[in-house]
Amino acid sequence: DGPARPRIEMQERWCNYVCEELTPRALEINREQGPDHMGKVLVGGASMGAGHAVNLFLRRPDLYNGTIALSGLYQADMFFKGYMDDLVYRNSPCDYMRNFPDNHPYKELYAKADKFIMCCGQGQWEEELLRSTLQLRDILESKDIHPIVDIWGQDVSHDWYWWEKQWVYFLEMTLGKA
């Protein structure tokens, strides 16, 4: 809680830190390990982390090569109770992707991404997140951007028990079995 502008400014500082400092440093360290460790980063998260992961990927597909997002909320209005400004908009994928121009250069990067996965259950505590996942899917599809959207059963709740199963499933799908 608290005033909206300082909270969203902190969110934007975090996003800038991850994109401008943390990720470049991680890539630099990987390059030092040799050619087998080069490339882009796959971002992922569950719950609030899913929202962050999708936001990072959609804002910076030049840095991130995809996302695995489990049970995410992809619009910022829940956190800002009707407040909207440039920074809230910039951190609300459903809002900014609705206005995404057809000729934007990121569109090609989204198409080249290894994986763009959004998953949500239909069980307890997933209702609003399921609506958000389907809303973002529909917005993206209308822009000819095609995420993998996997909706799990009505027994799948917003809980670590399920996210652990989903991580194993999607990491094997993305990276292959160990």
Regions found by a protein language model. Give the residues of each.
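Non-catalytic cap/lid and distal C-terminal segments of serine-dependent acyl enzymes
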Residues: 1-178
